[in-house]
Amino acid sequence: MIVLEGVKKSFGKKKILTGVNLKINEGSSLVIIGRSGTGKSVLIKCILALENYDEGTIHINKIENSNKNNKTFYDQFGMLFQGGALFDSIPIWENISFRLLRGNQKISRSDAKQLASEKLKLVGLNSDIIDLYPSELSGGMQKRVALARAIAGDPKVIFFDEPTTGLDPIMANVINRLIREIVVEMGVTAITITHDINSTRIIADDVAMLDSGKVQWKGKINHLDNSGNKMVDQFINGLATGPISNNY
């Protein structure tokens, strides 16, 4: 379980998070929605201890994440970055196994290649691409390789940062369903940030709306369309006017 209590973060005089309270149950898939600049990415970085927060606490399985110097702290996480973030200079198999070749779970190169082949199959790709380089793959294939890398270390928690950005609607739907299948099959906790409401409906068990530095609403995905929250209604329906219109 991940628990955030009163988390605040500012950059200079600019307040980004003004008191975030959030609970994410183990094995659940939470999608955080909200307009650009509301602090979604900053919040993820705070959970990952990549950004120091000013006030509040964040506990991951009852351990405060300020204990990031623990050598195994980052081993429990997987991450799918917005742009994929593959390394152009190394082949696909090494991209997938990158952390396992260097980190606390260090494995041999032959084992890493075998693991990469297995993870590729989980994301619907043939293992015959393992010796290719990212530039030789389509955007959709690159995204699936990045997803294979995110699950390579069998993480307990996976973060997805705008997973369908830059993809056509068909490939976006493929990625959404792959994410959902993997989250369910692996039994991991998933946290996704996205503007894509279609992605939200496929991936989420729970949804949190972040605005003005706080969680304005949190509920089950089947309550999203009847949340009773005007900010949520405005955002998911793309309305030009409403309680958040003056904040752009």
Label each PLM-derived region with a short phrase.
Residues I158-D161:
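Catalytic Walker B motif of ABC-type/P-loop ATPase nucleotide-binding domains
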Residues N65-G78, L224-S227:
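ABC ATPase NBD coupling module
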Residues D154:
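Conserved catalytic motifs of ABC-family nucleotide-binding domains
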Residues L48:
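Helix-to-loop junction immediately C-terminal to a conserved catalytic motif
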Residues G56-N65:
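Conserved ABC transporter NBD signature motif
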Residues R109-D128:
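Conserved ABC ATPase "signature" region
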Residues Y133-L137, M141:
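Conserved ABC ATPase signature
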